[in-house]
Every structure is written in C-alpha cells, then in structure tokens.
Amino acid sequence: MVKHVILWQLKDELSDAEKAAVKAGIKEGLEGLAGKVPGLVEVHVNINGLPSSTADLMLDTTFESAEALKAYSVHPTHVAVADGKVRPYTKARFCLDYEI
C-alpha cells in the first residue's frame, strides 16, 4: 500500500468566500474519484485546517501500490478534476508519497 498526501496553498488573490467555494469544489471533485480510479483505496480531503496551518487544504489518499498511484496521476477522471478544480486556484503544492 502507498500513501499519497498533498498539501496546497490557494492563490492570495482569492477572497475568503472564493477560497471556501474552491475548497468545497476540490473536496467534492477529488473525493468523487472514489470507485472511479482503479487501485485507489481511500480518498479524503481536509478543508478545515486550524488557523495555525500554513496550507489551505490536504489530500490524503491510499493506493494499492506504487503502480496504482502512477496510473492515477494520468487517469483522465483525475486529470479533469486537477485541471478544472485544483490547478487554476493553487499557488503551491507539496507532496509526500510513502509505503505503509
């Protein structure tokens, strides 16, 4: 099993209301991948960080294998969510992948 954890910072020019809407859209889009991407075991997006956080949201996923994670990265459904709901609104992305 492989964990794939992403932290994002949203663009500064977004208002608080826009950030809330973007976070909700990202959560809906990414959690909606459950059952649609082979090898994706679990997916959770946390959008309610404490004020002390330096990231705005976190993706926490579990995959059957490193190969499943690699396939996910180019899966058309994932790419559509990333291109439509994530990349246009984020300024920074941090990733940690590890075996469990």
What are these regions (language model features)?
Residues 66-94:
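C-terminal structural segments of small proteins and small subunits
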